[in-house]
Amino acid sequence: MSAGSFSAFAVAQCVAYSGSNVNDQDYVQWSDTVKSYLTVCDNGNYMRVQSGAIEGKLLVEYYSSDFEPLSTKLIDNELPIFGAFYDSGNNYYVLSGQENPKQNDSLEVFRITKYDKNWNKIKSCGLYGANTTVPFDAGSARMTHSGDHLLVRTCHEMYKSSDGNNHQSNVTIEVDMPSMTITDSYTGIMNVDYGYVSHSFNQFIKTDGNHIVALDHGDAHPRSAVLVKYNSDFTTGKFFPNYFEQVSNIDVVTYPEYTAGHYNYTGAAIGGFDVSSSSYIVAQSTVDLDYINTSETRNVYVSAVSKDLSTNKLNKITSYAEGTDSASAPQLVKINNNSFLLLWARDTKVNCVKLNADGTVNGSIHTFEGSLSDCQPVIKNGRAVWYVYDKNN
């Protein structure tokens, strides 16, 4: 990339771990939990956290600022299913879960575990029963925090309903970080006016002031990339709205009915969600939704929603011809409140371009050989850094 712009680097190391994360940010129908994380340590080195590389363990590796391997830690899994990792700046948090096929209200199905920066376990808290048979089913899990409040947005397969089916929806949890107590959660059935989305195939969560702002990939109720802004003040320890403060919501992109196969298919993959100085930014790749039953090539789109949810501007970033290679689900990297880096993979190349606060393109698209992964890139010294690994390479 040209001088003065952000450089993008993928780092490869020849280490024999099982699995691969190549292009794992991408999906066809529903997403999966993010299993690859990279953070910048206080001393300027890098720490990567990888789930699934070693059975029963969370792999933690440290690298120098020049990407030289330094040391490795193996952290025992808490509950059997990994959900997410989060670095709050002062502590690490790991979300895990376990299946509950017998619908046992006394079984812990979600657990949030707090560690110090040396990976010493401090304390954990959890939800029991919670209308959950399979945590993280057909979706993802992400965490954020503001002040002493840790916020979780994920999903689950629910207890069998009156129609005899186990449906899937999103889940939201709030944790008081100093005491590690869950102060609020919602795992029931409601409607989008209360932040409920079903099915929810991908989940994102941010804060804006004292309000939660979340994004879900819905296929039915509603069938859209739906942005939800809670009018409640989560700093009270409670986020779930009452009748008089229902959430504000907007269908960022509505997905037409799909009649050529199962209705779960929406022709879209959401890759990024963030908050700019003026807008809520949503990045995704979709087929030509006007021809959802026949279109196969996906292009990248960025939506900018005003903070009062009154306006919604769709910016088309790519124009790949139908029948050619698709763009993957993109990665959206925040540089500052007015600037973002958008990356997507296509064939054997990575493409990237800078965005303004309103989601419009700032400059030219740059292309280079490489791969993306489910590792959210981090910004350090003007560089976007992520990692890719593959047991076969």
Question: What is each PLM-predicted segment?
Answer:
Residues 4-12:
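Sec-dependent signal peptide cleavage junction
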Residues 11-393:
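Extracellular, repeat-based ectodomains that mediate carbohydrate processing or recognition
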